C-alpha cells in the first residue's frame, strides 16, 4: 500500500496548491505522512456526516472540495462542530485533504465534471488562466449542446442528471427559448456575469445566484444570455467527486497501489425541504 505522502503528492500533481486563490485554504489538514492508505473517500463537504461515513467505510483518507477551516480559528475543541470533525478523523487515523479553487480551475476541473454530467461539449474556459499557455485551465466552461434544447428541457436535464436537492433548478428567462451554447460554473457564479456576457452564450448554469445581480443581469437583455439556471451549490460540485475519484483510480492502477476509491452519496446540501408557491398559469413563472 502507498504511504499518505505518496498519495498526497499525486493529488498535488492534479491540483497544485499554488493554483488556489490567495484567500483559499487547501492541502492536507490532518494526517500522518507515513501512514498507509488503502481506502479513499471523496466528498464535497468535510462535515460530521461525512467524517462518520469515512469511519464506517474504514477510509484512510478523506478528500473534500470545501475546506474545513476557510478562515482562521483558535480552537479545534470537540465541543465545536469543526473540532469534532478533526477529533473524529484523528481518532480513526483518517487523513483529510482539500482541493478547492485549485480544483475549480484545473484541466479537467469542477466545471468540466459539471459539463460532463449534463452531456455538454466543452469548448474553452469561461475565464482562462493567463498562466496556462494551452488555454485549457481556468474558471467555468463555455460549452455547446450536441443538439439544441429549450431552456425548459435543459433545466429538466439538469434536474435529472445532478444529485437531487430540495432546491432543484431555478430558471430566469423564457422556458421555450432555444439553447445551443451554455456557460457552466460549479459553485457560486454570479461574480462571473461579465465573462458570461462576453462569451455570448444562450444560457448560464451555476449556483448561488442572488436576487439583485440576477435581476440586473436578466434585465439587460441586449447583452445577457437567454436564461439563467440556478442549481444547488453542492449539486453543481458533486460531479467533481466522481471525476477526482476516477483520476485517482487511474493513478492507483498505474502505480500498482490497488487503492479502493469511493464517492460519498450523502447529501450535505444545507437546504432540506422546499415548499412550492401556489400554482400559476405559467409553471415556470411567478404571480403578478
Protein language model features and the residues they cover:
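Hydrophobic structural segments
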Residues: 1-288
Amino acid at each position: 500500500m502507498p504511504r499518505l505522502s505518496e498519495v498526497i503528492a499525486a493529488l498535488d500533481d492534479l491540483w497544485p496548491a499554488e493554483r488556489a486563490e490567495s484567500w483559499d485554504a487547501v492541502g492536507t489538514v490532518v494526517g500522518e505522512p507515513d501512514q498507509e492508505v488503502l481506502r479513499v473517500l471523496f466528498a464535497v463537504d468535510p462535515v460530521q456526516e461525512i467524517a462518520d461515513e469515512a469511519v464506517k467505510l474504514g477510509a484512510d483518507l478523506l478528500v473534500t472540495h470545501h475546506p474545513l477551516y476557510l478562515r482562521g480559528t483558535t480552537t479545534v475543541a470537540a465541543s465545536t462542530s469543526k473540532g469534532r470533525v478533526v477529533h473524529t478523523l484523528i481518532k480513526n487515523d483518517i487523513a483529510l485533504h482539500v482541493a478547492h479553487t485549485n480544483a475549480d480551475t484545473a484541466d479537467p476541473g469542477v466545471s468540466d465534471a459539471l459539463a460532463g454530467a449534463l452531456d455538454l461539449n466543452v469548448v474553452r474556459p469561461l475565464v482562462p488562466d493567463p498562466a496556462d499557455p494551452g488555454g485549457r485551465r481556468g474558471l467555468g466552461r463555455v460549452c455547446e449542446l450536441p443538439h439544441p434544447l429549450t431552456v425548459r428541457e435543459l433545466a429538466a436535464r439538469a434536474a435529472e442528471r445532478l444529485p437531487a436537492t430540495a432546491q432543484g433548478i431555478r430558471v430566469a428567462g423564457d422556458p421555450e427559448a432555444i439553447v445551443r451554447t451554455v456557460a457552466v460554473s460549479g459553485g457560486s457564479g454570479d461574480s462571473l456575469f461579465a465573462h458570461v456576457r462576453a462569451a455570448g452564450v444562450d444560457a448560464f448554469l451555476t449556483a448561488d445566484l442572488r436576487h439583485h445581480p440576477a435581476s440586473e443581469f436578466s434585465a439587460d437583455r441586449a447583452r445577457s444570455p437567454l436564461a439563467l439556471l440556478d442549481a444547488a451549490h453542492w449539486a453543481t460540485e458533486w460531479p467533481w467527486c466522481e471525476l477526482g475519484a476516477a483520476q485517482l483510480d487511474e493513478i492507483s492502477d498505474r502505480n500498482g497501489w490497488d487503492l479502493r476509491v469511493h464517492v460519498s452519496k450523502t447529501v450535505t446540501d444545507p437546504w432540506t425541504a422546499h415548499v412550492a408557491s401556489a400554482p400559476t398559469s405559467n409553471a415556470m413563472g411567478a404571480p403578478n
